[in-house]
Regions:
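Hydrophobic/aromatic-enriched cytosolic interaction surfaces used to assemble or bind macromolecules
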Residues: 52-54
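Short glycine-aspartate micro-motif
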Residues: 3-7, 57-59, 125-129
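Structural signal for conserved beta-strand scaffold positions within catalytic alpha/beta enzyme cores
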Residues: 29, 102, 127-129
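Glycine-rich phosphate-binding loop and adjoining helix at the ATP-binding site
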Residues: 38-46, 57-58, 66-124
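Conserved NAD(P)H cofactor-binding loop of Rossmann-fold oxidoreductase domains
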Residues: 63
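Short glycine-rich, Thr/Ser-proximal phosphate-binding strand/loop in the N-terminal lobe
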Residues: 2-43, 73
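Short, well-structured alpha-helical patches and their helix-loop capping segments
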Residues: 84, 129-130
Length: 130
């Protein structure tokens, strides 16, 4: 299984390719160009996806309040214009046909720490990002 993971931030879109054991096979980043708006960001992400073959899943971590079940940015600040209401999951899935999962960036960081990092094996912890 090959998983293409994205972290959409205000400055960079960071991405990496992982295998089924979550080994990082490669990574890179491109400028977000947030001032161009949410649709432009999703188009940049899709452009990256289209450079790869054999991707089984896509994971997207993004700033803002996220409805992770539906993959929608429920609320975002003005740092990324026209990002509130962006249907990230359906936009990517409709264009690529690849199952896509979307989560808030802080929740994603906490999940990473719980499974692979400082909180591994701990029942309770707090993840604070600034």
């Amino acid at each position: 299984m090959r998983i293409l993971c994205f972290d959409i931030g205000g400055t960079f879109i960071k991405y990496g390719l992982c295998d089924e054991n979550f080994n990082l096979l490669e990574k890179d980043k491109i400028p977000t160009l947030a001032e161009n708006g949410g649709q432009s960001i999703i188009e940049r992400v899709i452009g990256i996806i289209e450079q790869y073959d054999g991707i089984d899943r896509i994971a997207v971590s993004t700033a803002g309040q996220v409805d992770s079940e539906n993959g929608i940015v429920v609320y975002s600040t003005d740092n990324i214009p026209y990002y509130t209401g962006m249907r990230v999951k359906s936009l990517i899935e409709n264009k690529t046909g690849i199952p896509t999962f979307v989560e808030n960036d802080v929740n994603s960081a906490a999940l990473g720490e719980a499974h692979f990092g400082a909180a591994k094996g701990v029942s309770d912890f707090i993840c604070l990002t600034l």
